């Protein structure tokens, strides 16, 4: 499974948890990991790790300002 596929699966699992499904399962490094509603923060950290590994994160920018 590629990192992109892992990221898509992790995002789908997060969506499932956030919409009321009690348990979501993700393949992580060749093993099966189950996340529950109480481990949403762990799943978000995992998604952030995958985004870094795939180069999908962008640095946050400050608010746009109007200068005269």
UniProtKB/Swiss-Prot annotation:
Domain of life: Viruses
Any single GO BP term: viral life cycle
The protein's role, per its UniProt record: Plays a role in morphogenesis of the virion head after genome packaging. Presumably interacts with the portal vertex to stabilize the packaged DNA within the head after packaging. Probably binds to the head-tail connector protein FII.
Protein name: Head completion protein
A Pfam family it matches: gpW
Presence of keyword Nucleotide-binding: no
Keywords, ordered alphabetically: Late protein, Viral capsid assembly, Viral release from host cell, Virion
A single GO cellular-component term on record: virion component
Broad class of where this protein is predominantly found: virion
Gene giving rise to this polypeptide: W
Record-linked Gene3D superfamilies: Head-to-tail joining protein W
Assembly behavior: Monomer in solution, assembles into hexamers on the prohead. May bind FII and portal protein (Potential).
Signal peptide: none
Family as reported in the entry's similarity comment: Belongs to the lambda phage gpW family.
NCBIfam families, alphabetized: phage_HTJ
Species of origin: Escherichia phage lambda (Bacteriophage lambda)
Subcellular location: Virion
């Amino acid at each position: 499974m590629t990192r992109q596929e892992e990221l898509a699966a992790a995002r789908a699992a997060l969506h499932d948890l956030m919409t009321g499904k009690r348990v979501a399962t993700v393949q992580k490094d060749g093993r099966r990991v189950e996340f529950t509603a109480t481990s949403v923060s762990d799943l978000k950290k995992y998604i952030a790790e995958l985004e870094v590994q795939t180069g999908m994160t962008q640095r946050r920018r400050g608010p746009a300002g109007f200068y005269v």
